[in-house]
Amino acid sequence: MKIVARTIPPRSAWMLEQAGVHPLLARLYAARGVQTREELDDGLARLLAPDGLRGAHEAALLLADAIRDDKRLCIVADYDCDGATACAVALRGLRLLGAKHVSYLVPDRVVDGYGLTPPIAERVAATGADVLITVDNGIASVEGVAAAKARGLAVLVTDHHLPGPALPAADVLVNPNQPDCGFDSKSIAGVGVMFYVLLALRSELRARGVFDLPAAAGPPQGGRASPSGGGEAHEVASRGVGRPQPKLDVLLPLVALGTVADVVKLDANNRRLVAQGLRRIRAGVMPAGVAALFKAAGRNAAAATTFDFGFALGPRINAAGRLADMTLGIECLTTDDSARAEELARMLDGINRERRDIEGGMRDQALLLAESLFDEDGSETPRAAISVFDADFHEGVVGIVASRIKDRYHRPTFVFAASGAPGKEHELKGSGRSIPGFHLRDALDLVAKRHPGVLLRFGGHAMAAGCTVAEEHFETFERALAQVAAEWLDAASLTRRLDTDGPLAPEYLRVDLVDTLHREVWGQGFAPPTFSEEVEVISQRLVGEKHLALKLRHKGQPVDGIWFGHTEPLPPRVVIAFRLDADEWQGVRRVRFLVEGAEI
């Protein structure tokens, strides 16, 4: 591991500090590309306008007509947290905006596979639906959309995944990554895309006179033209014609949760969405299911952080899609009955505990399989890419295990399990996680071109992807992916690099400052503050057989530390990378270091 301090543009840090930003925060923000205080404004008026998202206006027209004509809408969702929150946002939002007949369907991960397939389209048609809406999927569903259209359904695809060479022939496509879309936030999650469609729909309904413009409202979307093209004058003219306009900001806690849990890049617009959601949760304004999930996870909603989304609530919702039925997660997020929400949250918590047990066994076996590859090569270091398969692996957990192996060896990693779908027993379904510099979906595309027929299906992003191969072709895939990785990745890329914010002055070891840092929005692409320093190790001991508890001396001051998931002892003096945390003991809160890595 190589610990590297980020470059801090001195002028940006100085300008932020002069604008009143705390010196430490100014340094952290500048290192993440922030140059002015205005960029930190997380007000709703600073959100990008829906009219910049290609297809949003057309989606609004389609949905407004469907609501006017009392048509039946059916949402087809993905089975992860982004898909569940997107489905919940769609259900709640469409009902708020006047839709009377809205249902949903989530494919079974094992039986149905991912996304809108022809069989799923048939099931939607059988419900009597008139309009099919995908959330967090659909951009690759060429055959599924065709099947839905053949059954007479209108199809609205809302997605954020990268498109393939052919786009589905949907009535409307809304995806920031589709060709010719100029929307500035290419990293918006599926739940964010659906939220933007609802904003556009509300504006269209307002333009039609269905809703009043709120009396205190100014120009829509922070002074920008409305998605209907009417502008401020049209909106003001429509006031008093219809019923009060529904508030869509009640959906922001769900948008924030799905955005963080999907590990999309937290660009400026995503950070604003997350900040707005956190603000409402901390104030106690959230769906009953979100409150219940905080309670089930033992987390304090009044002090909610992005960590809670990514490591407490998100995994509990994801567990339903991995091991059970994501309808549990969606029902939890859509019910307004607090008692029912708590019951569902407890069920999700139990499923997540089961997931942890399965994951632990799979992780240990996957590590053994990965290490056996070293022996085959006669090397003490892994291949440029790792692919492992075991007949006993559970396909609902392969993605998590791939992430663990990737973190352990700093290699692009795929973990495969046998398909449980009827008639597909000889297919292997794999989930992959990558490292910086290796675009996983592009790598799969190259493997497919070099070895036609090996990949039955594939898709995904730069850092995460999925694919299906015939069992007989697994070794071919394994070698082919490793070959692509060997060509694309050099020695520096294959060395784990931990970027930090450099040394930390002793005066910043304060609990109140730790709380300030925790309240900020951190995540993918806007990394949580991590510092690096040489420290003296006073004492160390194992806790729970798998964590290293430390007594350290940092610039002459004693401080406690903990390295979760690490058991090897540290030398007397060592450079560590660490995050700040506040630990409480006997009613007293103290700063401690959460160790992320060490140069040993």
Feature map (PLM): residue ranges:
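Mid-to-C-terminal polyanion-binding domains and interfaces
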Residues: 65-69, 338-388, 422-426, 438, ...
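Acidic-glycine-rich active-site phosphate/pyrophosphate-binding loop
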Residues: 65, 165-175, 290, 552-555
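Non-catalytic interface/linker regions that flank or bridge core catalytic/transmembrane domains
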Residues: 2-3
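A short acidic, amphipathic alpha-helical/loop segment
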Residues: 143-147, 401-404, 512, 516
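Conserved phosphate-handling catalytic cores of large alpha/beta enzymes
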Residues: 125, 134, 138-216, 245-261, ...
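A residue-level signal for conserved active-site and pocket-lining positions in enzyme catalytic cores
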Residues: 29, 133, 318, 516-517, ...
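Hydrophobic helix-and-loop "lid/oligomerization" segment in the mid-to-C-terminal part
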Residues: 6-130, 151, 203-220, 224, ...
